[in-house]
Design a protein with these regions (language model features):
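Conserved extracellular-gate-facing transmembrane-helix segments in secondary transporters
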Residues: 14-23, 106
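Short amphipathic helix-loop junctions that connect adjacent transmembrane helices
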Residues: 24-41
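Helix-to-loop junctions at the C-terminal end of transmembrane segments
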Residues: 55-67, 151-152
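A late C-terminal transmembrane helix in Major Facilitator Superfamily
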Residues: 123-153
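A membrane-interface helix-boundary motif in multi-pass transporters
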Residues: 149-167
Length: 180
């Protein structure tokens, strides 16, 4: 189980890093690259946040039926589709509609990620919860470390491709974790 816990730490850290790259850069991408209004960035965050809670509840409902690993895989695929679609979207309406994928991604990560750690470490629930919480911090560190360098050298587009790559790493690691 220690190996599974370590792999899940990588999975969740990569998922949070991808999300944090998006959160750091999305407003600038919307304004500087797509030349859309700054109001849109706030609307996108608001819609995603409003949809995350129902997604967490839906994920909790399906958790016993399809398992945590499959739900996390659904989250990763949703995230990959979301970041790829954000790169291609050019209108405010499409950017807003895509937030459903973002909400699926984050709703499952927030709702199921911690439970997965706790199930892998049933004798250490507090440690499992802390470990999960630390994946968010590690994600911020990773995203913040590469963000400025990548934008300066390449572009905002490169960050979305990096986010997709991080989710690819998460997906590969997830496939080696026992489903509980």
């Amino acid at each position: 189980r220690k190996r599974d816990t370590r792999l899940l730490f990588v999975v969740c850290s990569m998922m949070w890093a991808a999300n944090n790259l998006y959160m750091i850069n999305m407003p600038l991408f919307i304004i500087d690259e797509l030349h859309l209004t700054d109001k849109l960035a706030g609307e996108m965050i608001g819609i995603a946040a409003g949809l995350e809670i129902p997604m967490m509840l839906i994920a909790g409902y399906y958790m016993k039926r399809i398992g945590k690993r499959l739900l996390m895989l659904i989250a990763i695929v949703s995230g990959m589709c979301f970041y790829a679609s954000v790169l291609m979207a050019t209108t405010p309406a499409i950017e807003l509609e895509l937030q459903i994928l973002n909400a699926i991604f984050l709703g499952i990560l927030c709702g199921i990620g911690m439970l997965y750690f706790q199930d892998l470490m049933p004798e250490k629930i507090g440690s499992a919860t802390t470990l999960y919480a630390n994946t968010s911090r590690v994600g911020w560190i990773i995203a913040g470390s590469v963000d400025g360098i990548m934008v300066e050298i390449w572009s905002y587009h490169a960050l979305f491709w990096l986010a997709i790559g991080m989710l690819g790493i998460a997906m590969i690691c997830l496939l080696f974790i026992k489903d509980i």
